[in-house]
């Protein structure tokens, strides 16, 4: 496997890999990484579909990329997906996946046309004082000291960030800024999370710094992530004859491990309550989704809280990974990520409006008609003075094809599930759907005397607790996640957010899909490049642009400097006078 960039590799079709007709594949899990691996097995690996087996413990495919209506409960979207135009692997695959809505076009075509015709941007990024605009006004509001703290992290070598927390690099100069309000609510970072991952995020999206305050950097699918992404992939795979095995719990993968050679020998399973297994040869390839951000997630209802279940049990991704990791140090250290759910949990809730009473309060804040079929909030609206640090968003409606035309679906999430609310004086994790809706309505500015009635009769709210949703953000060191293909691996690879691949950032669709592509390309030795992570961090234009925009348009040369620094700067500017360097610095408002 090798990385590439540019159209030469992107548009090429690889030859059929040698020996592929003698191989079979077993994929543990059916999330985005797993489905991506399956797609590349049949598309570029040209493996026969009937030789590809997807083992899924649940009743449907998709993993964390869900979207479902549960009978007698309501619509549920555990999360949402924010996409980037430089998700190189994602678009490499989705240009081949046919739309299930429009004949003759791809998922990428649909997505591209939609976001060109209806570009995303927010008209209100944050509120305070019960629905009033917090007037962040597109500003990061960073002091010179805060900007320098970010700069220091940006240039710190990865090796020096092992097991470090964000609090080791930032103080209140950053934490009290709009920058941190935007950042942690958009990406679900907490102050105690990994400094390494924080650095990787800044570098990965340096080309989008200017688009973070108003979300012009983002793009979204037409419907929820399940209907817009997962279903087309499933239909594509079914067309090749790929075998989906639902209700199959993988409890372990057994290996024969030597210092220089590691072979997967058996997959241990539970199916229909019976223990069994799949014996493997070296021609049987195993792709393992280890860990899981939505493991142990639980659902409540309008009148019941979502249980907070933290016990790791057999048959789930964490227990399986623990058993795998016990067999060889190269298979990672799962307990670095799942040891303390108090540091990794947050909650979401899906609110379905049932009439028009709530809509005017939404419209007042987002300044758009929620039923226009176009962008509504344009990303999350964060309630700046919320004790739960609540954010909410409304994507283009409808979010489900089955959704009533006069109903609006709102996604609400909060990072602090253990804090009492501002209206409902209970922690979010103890609240029913109705009570979470009441807290949200309070922050919309609904008159207090109308809140309970609206939450009960004008909305149906379904809460979801996810104890390990931020597990991948926990401080880590190299080796804590197994490489996608560990050294010496003969017939297996790891997939998903807890597999190690360089430069990319977790909690993204691209990361999952990248691990799937890299795993298949390595195991089948496919002779075509995997698109490298977009290299904006190496583009001086993006670096200069981000430097100015992070400081809200202020030139770096206007920072407070001592006499020696001023003299040095004057000398440097004199040296570049009349050169292309001077022109470039002026173009990007550095000088």
Residue ranges of each PLM-predicted region?
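Rossmann-like flavin
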Residues: 100-207, 219-220
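Helical element adjacent to the flavin cofactor pocket in flavoenzyme catalytic cores
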Residues: 203-285, 290-291, 303-304, 309-318
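Amphipathic alpha-helical segments that form well-ordered structural scaffolds
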Residues: 89-96, 182, 228-239, 435-443, ...
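Glycine- and aromatic-enriched mobile tails/lids
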Residues: 118-122, 421, 480-482, 498-510, ...
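Beta1-alpha1 glycine-rich phosphate/pyrophosphate-binding loop at the start
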Residues: 1-3, 37, 41, 45-85, ...
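N-terminal glycine-rich phosphate/pyrophosphate-binding loop and immediately adjacent elements
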Residues: 13, 19-149
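Extreme N-terminal leader/targeting segments of oxidoreductases
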Residues: 1-25, 43-51, 69, 550-558, ...
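C-terminal segments that line or cap access tunnels to active or ligand-binding sites in enzymes
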Residues: 207-221, 283-285, 290-515, 521-538
């Amino acid at each position: 496997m090798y990385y590439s960039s540019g159209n030469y590799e992107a548009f090429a079709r690889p030859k059929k890999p040698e020996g592929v007709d003698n191989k079979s594949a077993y994929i543990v899990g059916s999330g985005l990484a797993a489905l991506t691996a399956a797609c590349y097995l049949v598309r570029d690996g040209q493996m026969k579909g009937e030789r590809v087996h997807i083992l899924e413990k649940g009743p449907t495919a998709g993993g964390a990329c869900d979207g479902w209506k549960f009978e007698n409960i309501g619509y549920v979207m555990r999360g949402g997906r924010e996409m980037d135009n430089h998700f190189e692997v994602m678009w490499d695959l989705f240009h081949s996946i046919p739309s299930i809505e429009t004949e003759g076009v791809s998922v990428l075509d649909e997505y591209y046309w939609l976001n060109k015709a209806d570009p995303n941007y927010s008209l209100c990024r944050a509120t305070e004082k019960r629905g009033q605009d917090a007037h962040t006004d597109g500003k990061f509001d960073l002091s010179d000291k805060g900007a320098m703290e970010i700069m220091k992290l940006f240039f710190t070598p990865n090796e020096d960030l092992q097991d470090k927390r964000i609090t080791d690099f930032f103080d209140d100069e950053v934490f009290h800024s709009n920058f941190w309000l935007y950042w942690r609510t958009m990406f679900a970072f907490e102050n105690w999370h990994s400094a390494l991952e924080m650095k990787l995020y800044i570098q990965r999206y340096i080309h989008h710094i200017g688009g973070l305050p108003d979300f012009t950097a983002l793009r979204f699918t037409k419907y929820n992530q399940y209907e817009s992404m997962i279903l087309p992939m499933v239909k594509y795979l079914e067309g090749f004859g790929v075998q989906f095995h639902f209700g199959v719990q993988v409890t372990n993968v057994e290996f024969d491990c030597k210092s220089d050679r590691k072979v997967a020998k058996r997959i241990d399973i539970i199916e229909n309550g019976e223990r069994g297994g799949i014996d493997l040869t070296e021609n049987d390839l195993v792709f393992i989704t280890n860990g899981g951000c939505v493991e142990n997630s639980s659902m409540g209802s309008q009148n019941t809280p979502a249980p907070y279940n933290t016990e790791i049990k057999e048959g789930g991704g964490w227990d399986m990974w623990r058993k795998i990791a016990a067999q060889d140090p190269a298979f990672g250290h799962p307990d670095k990520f799942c040891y303390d759910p108090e540091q990794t949990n947050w909650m979401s809730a899906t609110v379905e409006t049932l009439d028009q009473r709530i809509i005017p309060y939404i419209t007042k804040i987002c300044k758009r008609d929620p039923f226009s079929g176009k962008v509504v909030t344009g990303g999350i609206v964060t309630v700046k003075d919320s004790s739960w640090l609540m954010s909410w968003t409304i994507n283009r409606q409808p979010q489900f094809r089955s959704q009533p035309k006069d109903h609006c679906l709102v996604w609400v999430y909060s990072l602090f599930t253990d804090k009492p609310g501002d209206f409902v004086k209970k922690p979010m994790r103890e609240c029913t759907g109705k009570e979470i809706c009441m807290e949200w309505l309070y922050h919309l500015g609904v008159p207090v005397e109308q809140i309970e009635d609206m939450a009960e009769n004008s909305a149906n709210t379904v809460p979801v607790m996810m104890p390990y949703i931020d597990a991948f953000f926990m401080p880590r060191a190299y080796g804590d996640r197994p490489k996608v293909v560990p050294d010496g691996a003969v017939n297996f690879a790891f997939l998903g957010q807890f597999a190690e691949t360089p430069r990319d950032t977790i909690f993204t669709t691209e990361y999952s899909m990248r691990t799937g592509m890299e795993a298949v390309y390595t195991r089948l030795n496919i002779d075509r490049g995997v698109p490298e992570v977009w290299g904006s961090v190496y583009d001086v234009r993006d670096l200069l642009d981000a430097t100015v925009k992070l400081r809200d348009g202020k030139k770096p040369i206007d920072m407070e400097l001592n006499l020696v620094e001023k003299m040095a700067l004057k000398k440097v500017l004199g040296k570049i006078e009349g050169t292309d360097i001077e022109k470039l610095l002026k173009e990007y408002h550095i000088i």
